[in-house]
Each structure stands twice: as structure tokens, then as C-alpha cells.
Swiss-Prot record:
Name assigned to this protein: Fusion glycoprotein F0
GO BP annotation list: fusion of virus membrane with host plasma membrane; symbiont entry into host cell
Post-translational modification: The inactive precursor F0 is glycosylated and proteolytically cleaved into F1 and F2 to be functionally active. The cleavage is mediated by cellular proteases including host FURIN during the transport and maturation of the polypeptide.
UniProt keyword list: Cleavage on pair of basic residues, Coiled coil, Disulfide bond, Fusion of virus membrane with host cell membrane, Fusion of virus membrane with host membrane, Glycoprotein, Host cell membrane, Host membrane, Membrane, Signal, Transmembrane, Transmembrane helix, Viral envelope protein, Viral penetration into host cytoplasm, Virion, Virus entry into host cell
Higher taxonomy: Viruses, Riboviria, Orthornavirae, Negarnaviricota, Haploviricotina
Bilayer disposition of the protein: Single-pass type I membrane protein; Single-pass membrane protein
Residues passing through the membrane, by range: 483-503
Signal peptide (from-to): 1-19
Gene: F
Subunit structure: Homotrimer; disulfide-linked F1-F2. Interacts with host LAMP1; LAMP2 and LAMP3; these interactions promote the cleavage of the viral fusion protein F.
Site (Cleavage): 102-103
Family: Belongs to the paramyxoviruses fusion glycoprotein family.
UniProt site positions, description: Determinant for fusogenicity and cleavage efficiency: 95
Compartment(s): Virion membrane; Host cell membrane
Amino acid sequence: MKAFPVICLGFAIFSSSICVNINILQQIGYIKQQVWQLSYYSQSSSSYVVVKLLPNIQPTDNSCEFKSVTQYNKTLSNLLLPIAENINNIASPSPGSRRHKRFAGIAIGIAALGVATAAQVTAAVSLVQAQTNARAIAAMKNSIQATNRAVFEVKEGTQQLAIAVQAIQDHINTIMNTQLNNMSCQILDNQLATSLGLYLTELTTVFQPQLINPALSPISIQALRSLLGSMTPAVVQATLSTSISAAEILSAGLMEGQIVSVLLDEMQMIVKINIPTIVTQSNALVIDFHSISSFINNQESIIQLPDRILEIGNEQWRYPAKNCKLTRHHIFCQYNEAERLSLETKLCLAGNISACVFSPIAGSYMRRFVALDGTIVANCRSLTCLCKSPSYPIYQPDHHAVTTIDLTSCQTLSLDGLDFSIVSLSNITYAENLTISLSQTINTQPIDISTELSKVNASLQNAVKYIKESNHQLQSVSVSSKIGAIIVAALVLSILSIIISLLFCCWAYIATKEIRRINFKTNHINTISSSVDDLIRY
């Protein structure tokens, strides 16, 4: 068993340059899935491909007359005539008409274009520009018409490379011409009719958009493949200086073609192919990861790391690749889409679990397992893992975030009723107990809208209920408060009345006593006065 603990080649302790530790990341539910070689491309040049759709037939000793060729020629003429007329209408506006417009000094028939987008007008401009290469096209036409070779290169004064392809001629050269003198004319005619009929059917199928308007419809991958036939690898290698296979270049759609001319007399089609310039960055890898849920601190969580990263040497970036074209082994981009990663994210990628961030699962539909090179990595605490061969349940300990199931532990695995056959051994040579603090789990996942809305609605209903109860209580408290206020006021008034009465009584008592005292003094004075008067009289 092999172990792949890291992807990059070095480790910088005192810098932010850190390697990706595949082993540790897999143990917390972050699994490497696909690695692409990063290449950049741009549409920088073009080439013309002359396709001869009617093969040359060598003369035979018995001078066979092939009716199939005549019929094929007639059918093909009917097929190509609309394309030729359409191209002529776009490239050559009517002599007496002013209904045309100039783009970069080129006259284009607007009536032939109809309603067109900017990209379609650009394609029409390209088509008209191709007409200026009439001398080169004529040279290619004359060169290919007399030859039986499947690929022929013609260079004119402009030094533009043109590759003449004869897909049917390649079939005629290898099969038909070697048997011309050994078979009867009828047999040869039947075989030739079969080959031509199949090829015509294929052309009719893949060129259907071009029959409508070739200037506004680029040639599809299937059409290019049909035009080039078995010579596709040779054409790609002759026009592109790259070691990338022709299949990947065509599948990525990097080669775009457009019909620029149809020569009905010679049954030839001239296609302009935009040739990209491809540059491969040898030390740049784009890596795809799949995140599955893991069992962290007694709850289902998922790690917060980018799904795709770019690694150049021992540096990592987030790499969305939104405008890139992916094939089996390569990713083609027109520019670098790299985004910086924080130091904590890089440390987490390096296997420093204490720097990783997890978020609890908010919804029920979560990826809980993934296939990895013939093995299964699953969160067996959140789904049922049952081995059927041999038959036993698979238990995931608390200190394991996920479980890796390979051929040594199970041959037929059932995950919540889904059966899988395990065919490989795991390349992980060790597993360690993971310790993750509670502070590393934060809510960063998008919420489950339906669940949260139901909670909000329930909270609102409860709030309305509580508000009604509160209003009722407030009303009760208000009435009670009024009654209490009246009682208090009555008591206060009564007390004040009693106090006032007491004060009045005290004042009356004091006043009465004072009046009596005054009266007593007055009577005493009167008595004295009377006594004095009596003394005076005596």
C-alpha cells in the first residue's frame, strides 16, 4: 500500500508556503477527487482546411461507370447549394442596393444576416475577410483536385498553413482502389454507394445548423470530426505545437470552425479554423475536493474549505474556474482565476486540524459518503453502514470523524440501502485520534429555508398570542388600578377629613378655653372694679 501524505514537494515552516496533507484531510471528510494540469489558451491564429467531398476514382480495366457517384454528386450539390448561396449573399451585397454596412472597411449584406447578435456579426466579418484570400483558396483548390493523398499542405505567399483533407478519399485509397480490378462493376458500385450514403447521412446530420445560415452558426465538434474524418490527429498535430491529444483539444471546443466558401464545381468546402495558442504551466495543478459530513464533537458537521484549489509548487489558491474548459486530464483557461487563501485555511490544508473551521449541518440532504479509488469514505454516525460480505454492522467510534472502508474490511457495502462493491485497498497507512475544540464549530452554512421559515412563523404566532395575553393583562391591570385609585383617594380624603375634624376640634377647644379664660379675667376685673367703687363710696 502506498501513502500520499502531501501533494506538493516541500514544506516551509517559517512562511505561508504549506503543502496539502491529503491523509489528514481525508480523515475529516475532505477528499481529493480529480487533478488537472493547468493550461492557458488564446485564439491567436487561423488556418484554412479544404475538404473534398467527392473522391477521385482510379480508372479500371473494365471502365466501370459508377452511378452511385453521379447520384451522390447530385445529392451533395442540393445539400451545398443553400450554403453557397447564403455565403454569396453575405459576402457580396446586391450591386444596386445600398442596404449594407461596413465593418472595418468590409461590406456585409445586412439583408442576408437578418437579426444578428454582435458575435454573429463578428462571424460574418470573419467570413467576408476570408474572401480576400481567394488566391490562396484557388491554389488549394487546384492542388487538391488532382491528388489522391488524404493530407496535402499548401503554402502561399502569406505563409498561412492550409491542410487539405479528403476523408472519403482516405477510405477509397485504403479499401476501394486496391480492389477495383478484382471485383465486378456492380459490386464496386454498391460498396461505393454504401460508403457515400453513410457519409452523406453524417454530413446532413451534423451540418444542419449550417444549412440555415453558415455565417451565424459555428461548426460543431461533430462537424469538424466528420469533415476531417480519420485525419483529425494529423490535422491537429500539424496546426498545433502541443503534446496534448487531439481528442482533448476537440472535446474542449478549443478549435472553432466556420464555412467560408463552397465550390460546387469541384465539390469542395473551405473551412476557416481558429487555431488556439496553448501554453501549459508544468508545475500548476488544479485539484478538486469533495466534502462530506463528519462526526465532530457529538454532532454532524462539515469542514469549511474550497471545493477547488490551485497548487503551484507549495502555494495554494482558491480556483473557481468558472470560465474554464475541462477535459479528462487538462483544464484550459484564458486567464488565471486564482483567489488568495487565509493563513488559517492554508494551515488547515496542511493538516493542522486546530486551524480548521467546521459548521453544523443545517439541512437533511447532505453528502455523507463518497467513492474514492474503489473504496468508500462515509460518515457512519449519520447513516447506516452495513457490510453484507461478510455480514456485520460497521461502527464508527466517537473519536473518528469519518470511516474509510476498503477491501480488507468489507467486500459488499450497504449505505442506507444502497449497495456498493469494494474493489480496492485504502492507501491510508495510519489513522489518528482527532481532537477538535468547540470553538472551531461555527454557523457558516446556508440555512434550511423551509425549516427556518416554519420556525419564524411559529415564533410570530407565539408572539401574537403573547401580545394578546399581555393586552388582556394590561386591561385587567388598568381596571384594577382605577378601582384601587378610587379607594386610595377615598381613604386619603377620609383621613384628611378626620385630621381636619380633629384639628378643628382642637382649635374649637382651645378657642373655647381661651374665651373662658378671657371671660374669667373680665369677671374678675369687674369684681375688683365693683369693690373699688364700693370702697370709694364709703
